Amino acid sequence: VMVFQPLPEGAHRAVLPGYNYPYHEAIDFYHHYKEDIALFAEMGFKVFRMSIAWTRIYPNGVEETPNQAGLDFYRNVFLELKKYGIEPLVTIQHYDVPLYLEETFGGWKNRRLIELFDRYTETLSGIQGPGEILADLQ
């Protein structure tokens, strides 16, 4: 099933001033995760459900090497959670297949995605070289 639906040719997504929520960066967890996690701990959270974006690790899904900045970000989030005794509950694919894979291969309809997804998960689990962001946080 293709979750991403491209717009018809010539159409543009509209962000109407004053109509949509005015702050388009949402909670900006990427820049505020340390403060957010400290607040979670203050509220007594023991588990934090989060997703890892495939595109933050392999932006197009077909790169030869993972994006080190993405790996570092998640490693830092996990270490911050560990510091406060909060266990991460991680989703590794949440309807966010890289757009390039949707456009080039048709998404999950193409078996090539199994190989690419396998490489992505190996990177996350530390099996594939420098991407060991989950393995050493036990």
Please tell me what each predicted stretch does.
Residues 2-38, 43:
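Aromatic- and Gly/Pro-rich amphipathic surface segment
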Residues 37-138:
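Substrate-binding cleft and catalytic face of glycoside hydrolase catalytic domains
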